[in-house]
Structure formats: C-alpha cells, structure tokens
C-alpha cells in the first residue's frame, strides 16, 4: 500500500512539474513574439491608390489560390488544406464585416501577416504561410489590406478546422511556434 501511495505521489509531482514548465514556456513564447500589433493610423483617403499596389501584391502572393474554394466566391475561404494532422480550412478574407476581415483594422491584418495571430489574438496555423509573410513590410501589408477591403464582401462563415488531438489545441501550436517560428522584419535595400 505504501509503495502505491509513493508511486501516486511521484506521478503527481511529475505532472505538476510538467504543467508548471508548460506554463512558463507558454509565457516565454508570448513574450518572445514581442508586441502583437504595430499600431499606426491607416489613411483611408489613400486607400484607392494603395489598393492598386495591394491588388498586385495579392496576385503575386497568390492569395486567391488558398482563399477561394472550388466553385466558390473569390477570397471567401472554405478551401480545405489536407495535412498529416487533419484538414485546415482557409478563412474568408473578403470585406464582409461579419465573416470576413471587414471589421479588422490594418493593424489586425499586420498582426496576422507578421505574427501569425488573428484579430482576437488566437494563434494561426502555419498552413497560412505567415512564417514567410512575416518578412513583408508594413507598407505592403497595408496595401494588401486596402485591396482586400475593396473586394466584394461575401457573407460566408469560416469552417472549423478538422484536426486531430493534440494538433487542434493552441498549446500544441504554441510549442510548434517556439521551435520553428520567429517574427522577422524585412528591411529593403535603399
């Protein structure tokens, strides 16, 4: 009986140490990413001129390839991306205020592109290649955002991802980010 109690006590101690270590790591990961939003005003008056450049960047980035489901509306999302962990569904990036990015700010869009975080701070899956887009300049993300706001709004709810446990958790995603992602800042040559 004493052996069983000792074994249970040791197991609980190990679980507590692992949980404590996990919380410390998650705190470090959050701090490591730095400030989540570089806040600066978005000049709505310049939006039409900037949107022209954004249209080019969105085309070069081939955003429609992922954010348009077969037979669906452009940029309305819903396309499934199969991975060995399950299926990730792309989001609606039209200007719809309820289901798209129409209620986002330019800073929210920058946060998604640069830090891989949604408007609400949720970590995004790297099926969205923010690991590469982190190098895009703020001016370029503002231009892309201006263009996407000019796209016809499509009210289409985002499908939930169909990922296996534990890959469907923010904790697993945080661990992946700690190992493989660091936000970067691209500085073009002058």
Segments the model singles out, each with a brief description of its role:
Residues 24, 29-33, 159-187:
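Alpha-helical membrane-targeting segments
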Residues 2-37:
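N-terminal type II signal-anchor transmembrane helix
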Residues 34-59, 173-190:
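Electrostatic cytochrome c docking/interface patches
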Residues 43-51, 56, 86, 102-106, ...:
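Solvent-exposed, acidic/flexible segments
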Residues 23-29, 105-119, 132-158:
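C-terminal capping alpha-helices of c-type cytochrome domains
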Residues 70-106, 124-138, 161-172:
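Gly/Gly-Pro-rich "capping" loops immediately C-terminal to redox-active cysteine motifs
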Residues 26-47, 70-85:
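Conserved N-terminal glycine/acidic-rich loop preference
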Residues 54, 60-70, 109, 144, ...:
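The canonical Cys-X-X-Cys-His
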């Amino acid at each position: 009986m004493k052996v069983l109690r000792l074994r249970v006590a040791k197991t609980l101690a190990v679980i507590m140490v692992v949980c404590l270590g996990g919380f410390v790591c998650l705190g470090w990961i959050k701090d490591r990413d730095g400030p989540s939003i570089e806040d600066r005003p978005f000049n709505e008056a310049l939006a039409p001129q900037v949107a022209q450049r954004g249209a080019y960047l969105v085309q070069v980035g081939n955003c429609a390839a992922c954010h348009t489901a077969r037979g669906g509306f452009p940029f309305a999302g819903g396309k499934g991306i199969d991975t060995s962990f399950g299926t990730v569904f792309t989001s609606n990036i039209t200007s719809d205020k309820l289901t798209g990015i129409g209620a986002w700010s330019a800073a929210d869009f920058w946060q998604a592109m640069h830090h891989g975080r949604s408007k609400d701070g949720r970590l995004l899956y790297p099926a969205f290649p923010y690991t590469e887009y982190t190098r895009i300049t703020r001016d370029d993300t503002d231009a892309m955002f201006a263009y996407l706001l000019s796209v016809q709004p499509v009210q289409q709810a985002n499908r939930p991802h169909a990922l296996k446990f534990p890959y469907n958790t923010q904790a697993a995603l945080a661990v992946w980010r700690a190992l493989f992602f660091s936000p970067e800042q691209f500085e073009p040559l002058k």
